[in-house]
């Protein structure tokens, strides 16, 4: 299977419009009301609630708990986010690149994982496999670890779980 991780997901830090997109009317109303609760003016067109934000990445970092508290997992998967700025205009063609809200929240939650990917800080350890009958090495297995900024290791179970949930496998 081909690797899908050529394009590393990131959240813009430029002044942008953040579009919350869904075909479920109740989620449009809920999204609009919750953005107003946060103090944002919203604009709505059918299926899209829009706010303007100076730094979308900081917006998701600051409101991480708010989104997790006020939206359940099904809602976070249903609501798609599109960040529009001068580099990325919303159109009929680009709207298909909108990602689920969960993807943005995972990006914030899994910051250590993305640091490992961005910095290419993976290490491999080779471990011998011993034949119990002959007590000789008959093969080796490679164990991949991510190296965190503080030097600690992210073990394969965590590394691969974060890779899968961020669609990087």
PLM regions and their residue ranges:
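N-terminal accessory interaction module
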Residues: 3-102
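Bacterial c-di-GMP phosphodiesterase EAL domain
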Residues: 97-169
């Amino acid at each position: 299977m081909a690797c899908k991780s050529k394009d590393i997901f990131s959240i813009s830090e430029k002044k942008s419009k953040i579009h919350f997109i869904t075909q479920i009317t109740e989620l449009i109303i809920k999204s609009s009301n919750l953005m107003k609760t946060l103090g944002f003016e919203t604009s709505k067109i059918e299926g899209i609630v829009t706010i303007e934000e100076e730094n979308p990445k900081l917006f998701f970092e600051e409101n991480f708990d708010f989104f997790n508290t006020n939206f359940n997992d099904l809602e976070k998967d249903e609501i798609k986010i599109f960040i529009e700025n001068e580099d990325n205009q919303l159109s009929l063609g680009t709207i298909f690149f909108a990602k689920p809200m969960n993807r943005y929240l995972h990006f914030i939650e899994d910051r250590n994982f993305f640091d490992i990917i961005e910095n290419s800080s993976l290490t491999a350890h080779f471990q011998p496999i011993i034949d119990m009958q002959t007590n000789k090495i008959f093969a080796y297995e490679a164990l991949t670890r991510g190296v965190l900024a503080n030097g600690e290791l992210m073990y394969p179970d965590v590394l691969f779980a974060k890779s899968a949930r961020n669609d990087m496998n």
